[in-house]
Amino acid sequence: MTLTDDELFKELERELFAAHEGTPDLATIDRLYADDFLSTNADGRVVDKKGWLDILKASQFPVDRITTDDFKVRKYSDTAIVTGRSAYHYAGKKLWEVRHTQVWANTSGRWQLVGWQGTSVPHEA
């Protein structure tokens, strides 16, 4: 059975976020992120793959649950743009929420995340 583009990238996103929940699954993150991965975080920091793995190894990303919605995918040959909203929770409280854009590239028959950009969503009162 062949997955639709939406199904494929929804599964990749699910795997990506699940790898960041609780104790990070560094092997999965290393596999999903391209070596030239670059993230522009909601706080304005620019972080490469090594920098992000270092943050996770140092337990500087305390998240036990990530929820997502408003998922959309646009695929262009060997590149896909995935947008959505993600909320990051710890100990039953929402820590922050972002609108995110993911850039995926198919290299050597494997989809990997090459870019991430997050924009903070203000907390509602």
Please describe what each predicted stretch is.
Residues 2-31, 36-125:
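A beta-strand edge to alpha-helix "cap/lid" segment located at domain peripheries
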